[in-house]
């Protein structure tokens, strides 16, 4: 009976440490995905600005 309690305690400690290491791995992937999203957002904003400038030039050229 005492061995069972010790086994459960050790298994619980291992589960806690394994959960923390998994969180670190998932956190790294999440940060990479977030960075890709930020770059996509910035590129879209920059592209819209260039498109607006081109539209203004075209409108000015037409008169």
UniProtKB/Swiss-Prot annotation:
InterPro entries named in the record: Cecropin, Cecropin_insect
Leader sequence residues: 1-23
PANTHER family xref list: CECROPIN-A1-RELATED
Annotated localization: Secreted
Keyword Metal-binding: no
Chain's role: Sarcotoxins, which are potent bactericidal proteins, are produced in response to injury. They are cytotoxic to both Gram-positive and Gram-negative bacteria.
Entry keyword set: Amidation, Antibiotic, Antimicrobial, Immunity, Innate immunity, Secreted, Signal
Protein name: Sarcotoxin-1A
Source organism of the structure: Sarcophaga peregrina (Flesh fly)
């Amino acid at each position: 009976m005492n061995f069972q309690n010790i086994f459960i305690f050790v298994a619980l400690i291992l589960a806690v440490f394994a959960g923390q290491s998994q969180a670190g791995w998932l956190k790294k992937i999440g940060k990479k995905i977030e960075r890709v999203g930020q770059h996509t957002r910035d590129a879209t904003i920059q592209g819209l600005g260039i498109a607006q400038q081109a539209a203004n030039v075209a409108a000015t050229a037409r008169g």
